Design a protein with these regions (language model features):
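Short, hinge-like loop/turn segments at secondary-structure boundaries
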Residues: 14-19, 66, 89-92, 114-117, ...
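Conserved beta-alpha-beta core of the PfkB/ribokinase-like small-molecule kinase fold
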Residues: 46-116, 124, 132-134
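Short alpha-helical
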Residues: 6, 55-56, 152
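Short loop segments at secondary-structure junctions
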Residues: 16-19, 27-29, 102, 110, ...
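Conserved N-terminal subdomain of the carbohydrate kinase-like
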Residues: 1-46, 208-226
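Short beta->alpha linker loops
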Residues: 3-6, 52, 102, 129, ...
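Short, acidic/turn-prone active-site loops that include or flank metal/cofactor-
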Residues: 3-4, 26-29, 75-79, 102-103, ...
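Conserved phosphate-binding/catalytic region of the ribokinase-like
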Residues: 111-226
C-alpha cells in the first residue's frame, strides 16, 4: 500500500463504432518501479510484462534479462509513451512479443525497422487483428488464426488481455501454435460478450464445447483441462 496515493484508475469511453477514448490516472502505479521480482526461493518460471508504469516495465526487462527468466512482452497502450530504444530493449530478449496490428506498426516505426524485421527480432510474435483473427510468426513459420464467433459484441474492452491470457495458457502448456492461437481467440471472444473486462465465466466443459463449435474437435484440450 502506498500511503497518500489513490489506486490507478482507467476510464474507457466506447462509441457504437468501437472507437475509444481513454482517460487514465496512474496513482500508486507510478511507484511500481520500486518493486523487484521475488528471486529468493520463489523464482518465477515465466514473466508477463504488460502495460504498467514505463519505468517499471523497463526494470522488469532488465531483471528478466539479468536472471535469464523468459518473458512475454506486451507494451500495448504504453507503446505511444515509449521511445524506440526502450521498445527495442524489451523486444530483444523476449520469448514472445504480442500486440495488435496498430501497435506493431507503431513499434516498428519507433524502432526504425519494418514489421517484417520486427518479427525477426523476436522468435515468436503474435499480431491480433480484431474480428479478422490473429497471425502468429514463429521462427519463419506463419500461422493464421481465425476469430471465434461471439454470440454478441457487448464491449471490446479487455479483449486483448483475455487473448493474452489464453495464449499464455496454451504456450506454457507446450501446445502447438495453431491450437494455442485458437485458445486465445476463444478466450477473447468471451470477454467481448460482456460489459466489464473480467465479468465473463465459463467451465472447462463449456470452453471445450465452444472450441469444437468454432474450430473443430481438439483432443489436446482434454489433456490440457484434464
Amino acid at each position: 500500500v502506498i500511503e497518500g496515493d489513490f489506486t490507478a484508475s482507467c476510464f474507457i469511453n466506447t462509441d457504437l463504432s468501437d472507437n475509444q477514448i481513454t482517460a487514465f490516472y496512474p496513482g500508486a502505479m507510478a511507484q511500481a518501479h520500486r518493486q523487484r521480482l521475488p528471486l529468493d526461493g520463489h523464482r518465477p518460471d515465466f514473466v508477463i510484462i504488460a502495460p504498467n508504469d514505463p519505468a517499471a516495465m523497463a526494470q522488469l526487462v532488465i531483471e528478466c534479462q539479468t536472471n535469464n527468466i523468459p518473458y512475454l512482452y506486451d507494451p500495448s497502450m504504453q507503446a505511444p509513451r515509449m521511445n524506440g530504444p526502450e521498445l527495442l530493449a524489451g523486444c530483444r530478449s523476449a520469448a514472445a512479443l504480442i500486440g495488435n496490428d496498430y501497435e506493431f506498426a507503431m513499434m516498428a516505426e519507433k524502432i526504425g525497422c519494418t514489421e517484417e524485421e520486427l518479427h525477426q527480432v523476436v522468435g515468436l510474435t503474435v499480431v491480433t487483428k480484431g474480428g479478422e483473427g490473429a497471425t502468429i510468426y514463429q521462427n519463419g513459420q506463419v500461422y493464421e488464426i481465425p476469430a471465434a464467433k461471439p454470440t454478441i459484441v457487448a464491449d471490446p474492452t479487455g479483449a486483448g488481455d483475455a487473448f493474452r491470457a489464453g495464449f499464455v495458457r496454451g504456450y506454457l502448456a507446450g501446445l502447438p501454435m495453431p491450437v494455442t492461437g485458437r485458445i486465445a481467440s476463444l478466450t477473447a471472444c468471451y470477454a467481448i460478450e460482456h460489459h466489464g473486462t473480467q465479468e465473463h465465466r465459463h467451465t472447462k466443459a463449456e470452453f471445450m464445447a465452444r472450441y469444437e463449435e468454432n474450430f473443430g474437435a481438439e483432443p489436446l484440450l482434454a489433456e490440457l483441462f484434464g
